Amino acid sequence: MSVKIQQISPGDLTLYASVSIAFEARSVYRVETREQGLGGLLLVEELVDPYIKDYDAQAEGNDRPNQWAQQFDLRQWGFLMAMDGERAAGGAAVVMNSPEVHMLENRSDLAVLWDMRVQPEQRGKGIGRRLFQHAAEWARVKGCT
């Protein structure tokens, strides 16, 4: 079945949250400075014993998608779902014009990809790339650069 990307409303965040964000990590990255920072920074990858990283399981308070409305005004947010028939295959959340999100610097021409997730059994099929492309287009249409 072909996967279709569609926009959903904040009322559908329970469906969005049903997509697992957990993944297996096999390395960590460490920042090294060169010449006390004057020579730049180097990102060094270190292999570690594999472990499961699950941001939803680590989330506190209102950090899970189905709780975002308790912390943020979602009227200017864009929510995209990748649907494989009736099954949620992935999702992306894009934020703009949200004063609570300080990285936007109260500018109306900026957007940020807040969250992106793809079901584990759907990974490696290009769904994340398609969600990213749709998220970028959503922001462009809204006037973000």
Name each model feature, range by range.
Residues M81, R87-M96, V112, R117:
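Conserved beta-strand in the GNAT
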Residues T33-F79:
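Active-site rim helix/loop that mediates acceptor-substrate recognition in acyltransferases
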Residues V31-L43, D84, V94-D109:
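Conserved donor-binding loop and adjoining core beta-sheet/short helix segment
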Residues T145:
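Short acidic/polar active-site loop segments enriched in Thr and Asp
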Residues V118, G124-E137, V141:
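Conserved acetyl-CoA-binding loop-helix of GNAT-fold acetyltransferases
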Residues L104-P120:
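Conserved acetyl-CoA binding element of GNAT-fold acetyltransferases
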Residues M1-P50:
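Conserved N-terminal entry element of GNAT/NAT acetyltransferase domains
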